Amino acid sequence: MANSSSRYSVLTAAHWGPMLVETDGETVFSSRGALATGMENSLQSAVRDQVHSNTRVRFPMVRKGFLASPENPQGIRGQDEFVRVSWDEALDLIHQQHKRIREAYGPASIFAGSYGWRSNGVLHKASTLLQRYMALAGGYTGHLGDYSTGAAQAIMPYVVGGSEVYQQQTSWPLVLEHSDVVVLWSANPLNTLKIAWNASDEQGLSYFSALRDSGKKLICIDPMRSETVDFFGDKMEWVAPHMGTDVALMLGIAHTLVENGWHDEAFLARCTTGYAVFASYLLGESDGIAKTAEWAAEICGVGAAKIRELAAIFHQNTTMLMAGWGMQRQQFGEQKHWMIVTLAAMLGQIGTPGGGFGLSYHFANGGNPTRRSAVLSSMQGSLPGGCDAVDKIPVARIVEALENPGGAYQHNGMNRHFPDIRFIWWAGGANFTHHQDTNRLIRAWQKPELVVISECFWTAAAKHADIVLPATTSFERNDLTMTGDYSNQHLVPMKQVVPPRYEARNDFDVFAELSERWEKGGYARFTEGKSELQWLETFYNVARQRGASQQVELPPFAEFWQANQLIEMPENPDSERFIRFADFCRDPLAHPLKTASGKIEIFSQRIADYGYPDCPGHPMWLEPDEWQGNAEPEQLQVLSAHPAHRLHSQLNYSSLRELYAVANREPVTIHPDDAQERGIQDGDTVRLWNARGQILAGAVISEGIKPGVICIHEGAWPDLDLTADGICKNGAVNVLTKDLPSSRLGNGCAGNTALAWLEKYNGPELTLTAFEPPASS
């Protein structure tokens, strides 16, 4: 064991923030957060588990049946053995098959449009590097949208002219100063603020702590009493609608506003368009059904008196509606955020200090004021003379693309066709955990001629590949990042902590070598003649130039890199007074939105003209395929929420699992009434099933969930036992969820649309194997 005197700390970062990692240069001993926030983030303690995990991919591996006959492989992906090969053998095999498929079927046959959360650095983003290589080789099929916000990304540009989900919010200082009421609607920031797309600046939870102590009226609207509600304790009211009925609840509130003359007609006339069409629906003039509080109560399970009370509270106070993303990850998900904007517009508080709505307070610390900052540039998926994506598919429709090559589909007003995908390369992502209906995915995954996975760990995706390449973790290479997707609060060196484990290589180096195989001089073309540190210096020097325009001076790169310290950017007083939509609301003609009318569109003629029955021209209540209202006897709604101690599937294998696993499986939260009906006790192993599959989970009995709803957090690694009817032993919720698009408009993920049965498990003991590498690896 290393002498403690030889240990030192290295500054680096991950999606969960800057960290100090204790090492002796070969072994990681511990890790902790580098920012003094007073709020513990469990994810920051897991670096040792990431680097030294037994589930690391150690060597290049090829599926046995594929290696024997690449053009006519035998065996089944996910069931075949793996054979260790050298790096040269693996890269030669990839190059040969890539060349064959591209020449035979064209660039659209190659899906390299994956994305994922492996690294937050500006250089070593695996998906970007993959796309850069494929651009050099002549193009590929890319992706549209993402799994997190596919529906919202599609609808919000029509409604307010931008995505909103990835944009800065009205500043937290103004919320704390001016808001009277703050509503968390389908948002659990105590969990989701642990991460960011870059590195977390870790300020959001401090603001929520201040909110807890502010004396304001705080309301959470969610089928589950989340960790955030527990954090606020008796200072927050929990309102629990039936899952998937948020639009009905909002319509009931909106009707109450009109019924009492509380809607702001002047704001609606000046800053919106289409309200009259929506009002005709709201009041029942167009369909004969007035969307009263009583009507809404029958659907959403919240009493009519409470609905009227919410309307009065929202009207009588400066109200900030902080909406999360879970409710738009449902069938007809576009309606949820469209309706919350409509409700905020009816209140007339958009563009005011502390009022309106926000769709990103729960992610990446939205509302933390943007600093005067020297912002890094980053590696691009394009390169000079290359060919970018020749086609793109909605990322959540990859399975349908594989099942139906050439098939017609509609997307965002366009008639499109799925490409004929023959080759998939997934780098830096975990599609087997984030895609719905796992068994359908596994069947479709057999169709391509070649599947390559670049991975640090033996995930389910890696186990279902033909070729698996061992990748470095972020702690085995050098990189740079910013903290705060919106604040740009810090510039952080992500310094290499330990050498690469086993035969792991940087994706940057792998794709550079493949580029040289593709064409003479390809290595130099891919790298542009720069090494890892030279690229980092280039990105840093761009930040220095940008900083100079903001009166922010950075030291020379060599000095910065040697210092092993982050740089905090200066505060910007203007950002601390930032109000989203303030300029527009003050003068809509001078500052129009980027919508068709220049105003907030409560009714969109463009969307109406598309004629989509699943996304009409204004927000509406549409009944999902699977919900409480059409459940069969004893079926329960399945809520797939963000986990507390993982980033989606990342760290599922780590020691953090000891903090949440029940019966050595993913926990499922069950209301006592539902548990009692089924003879289930706390800690029991239970079976959940529907027509799509079955899983085992560990029972957690809690009053903190709506009766008729069960919650299983997304991200557990699939662990299907083919000797036991394919039951997932680890509790991967997407075995149960329905793979259907949110609508023709967005084609977003609808992972919160599922019903399942539940019972106490009385079958044979099934050993967990999710985190075991293949026998030959």
Curated annotation (Swiss-Prot):
Its biological purpose: This enzyme may serve as a scavenger, allowing the cell to utilize biotin sulfoxide as a biotin source. It reduces a spontaneous oxidation product of biotin, D-biotin D-sulfoxide (BSO or BDS), back to biotin. Also exhibits methionine-(S)-sulfoxide (Met-S-SO) reductase activity, acting specifically on the (S) enantiomer in the free, but not the protein-bound form. It thus plays a role in assimilation of oxidized methionines.
EC class: oxidoreductase
EC number in record: 1.-.-.-, 1.8.4.13
UniProt GO cellular component terms: outer membrane-bounded periplasmic space
Cofactor(s) this protein cannot do without: Mo-bis(molybdopterin guanine dinucleotide)
Annotated Mo-bis(molybdopterin guanine dinucleotide) binding sites: S148
Reaction equations catalysed: [thioredoxin]-disulfide + L-methionine + H2O = L-methionine (S)-S-oxide + [thioredoxin]-dithiol
Cofactor mode of binding and number, as noted: Binds 1 molybdenum-bis(molybdopterin guanine dinucleotide) (Mo-bis-MGD) cofactor per subunit.
Organism: Escherichia coli (strain K12)
UniProt-recorded Gene Ontology molecular function terms: electron transfer activity; L-methionine:thioredoxin-disulfide S-oxidoreductase activity; molybdenum ion binding; molybdopterin cofactor binding
Family: Belongs to the prokaryotic molybdopterin-containing oxidoreductase family.
One GO term of the biological process aspect: anaerobic respiration
Domain description: The N-terminal 39 residues are essential for activity.
Keywords in alphabetical order: Metal-binding, Molybdenum, Oxidoreductase
Disruption phenotype: Cells lacking this gene together with metB1, msrA and msrB are unable to use Met-S-SO for growth but retain the ability to use the enantiomer Met-R-SO, while a metB1/msrA/msrB deletion mutant is able to use both compounds.
Keyword hit for Oxidoreductase: yes
Protein name per UniProt: Biotin sulfoxide reductase
Pfam families: Molybdopterin, Molydop_binding
Note from the entry: Requires a small thioredoxin-like protein for activity.
